[in-house]
């Protein structure tokens, strides 16, 4: 079913989600592997970001990941920079609740997002960027049939060391082929 599995539901992000997003955005452990800029944000800055960048954009679709049984928000996933003419988008995901890390929620959420992007929006290509030191995410994306397309060498400075940003993407045809094989 679109936007839910046995364990999670994706629902549209609203302004009421700002507080939980603010908590995740200020958790260095959560943002360490996904955000190029680590900082501490005031609630007003997060409110402005949510209203202008997330909710105010006509080129993105942003969803809160809910644990189905408890209805507790556990993360956020989005299609951003949606280009309707060329049928391309970029995807992002953050699992904000650390107690559910490593339990497969990210994989489920990404599958739902890809289903929506490819089977409902009829996108041709979905891309992402991942830090080279985020091995778990790279394995997850490869499991979903994302292919490495390139890398921005030494593009992120984290903990005193330069790291690459890996560019990955999956085409609609590859995604549909993968679905047939399963």
Question: Where does each model-flagged region fall?
Answer:
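Short glycine/proline-centered loop/turn elements that form peptide/ligand docking sites
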Residues: 106, 110, 133-137, 154-159
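Short loop/turn microsegments at loop-to-beta-strand junctions
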Residues: 21, 60-61, 151
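Conserved acetyl-CoA-binding loop-helix of GNAT-fold acetyltransferases
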Residues: 102-116, 138-143
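Active-site acidic-Proline motif in GNAT/NAT acetyltransferases
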Residues: 97-99, 103, 132-133
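Conserved GNAT acetyl-CoA-binding A-motif
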Residues: 119-129
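Acetyl-CoA-dependent GNAT
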Residues: 41-99, 171-174
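A short, well-structured alpha-helix characteristic of acyl/acetyltransferase catalytic modules
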Residues: 1-47, 174-182
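Conserved catalytic-core motifs of GNAT/GCN5-like acyltransferases
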Residues: 127-130, 147-167, 179
């Amino acid at each position: 079913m679109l936007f839910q599995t046995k364990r999670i539901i994706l629902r549209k992000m609203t302004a009421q989600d700002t507080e939980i997003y603010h908590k995740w955005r200020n958790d260095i452990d959560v943002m360490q592997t996904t955000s190029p800029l680590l900082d501490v944000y005031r609630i007003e800055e997060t409110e402005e970001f949510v209203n202008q960048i997330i909710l105010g954009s006509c080129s993105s679709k942003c969803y809160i990941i809910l644990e189905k049984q408890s209805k507790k928000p556990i993360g956020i996933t989005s299609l951003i920079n949606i280009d309707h003419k060329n049928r391309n988008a970029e995807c992002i995901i953050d699992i904000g609740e650390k107690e559910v890390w490593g339990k497969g929620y990210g994989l489920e959420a990404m599958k739902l997002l890809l289903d929506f992007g490819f089977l409902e929006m009829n996108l041709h290509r979905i891309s992402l960027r991942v830090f080279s030191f985020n091995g778990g995410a790279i394995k997850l994306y490869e499991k979903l049939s994302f292919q490495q397309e390139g890398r921005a060498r030494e593009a992120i400075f984290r903990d005193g060391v330069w790291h690459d940003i890996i560019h990955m993407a999956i085409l609609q045809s590859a995604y549909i082929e993968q679905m047939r094989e399963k």
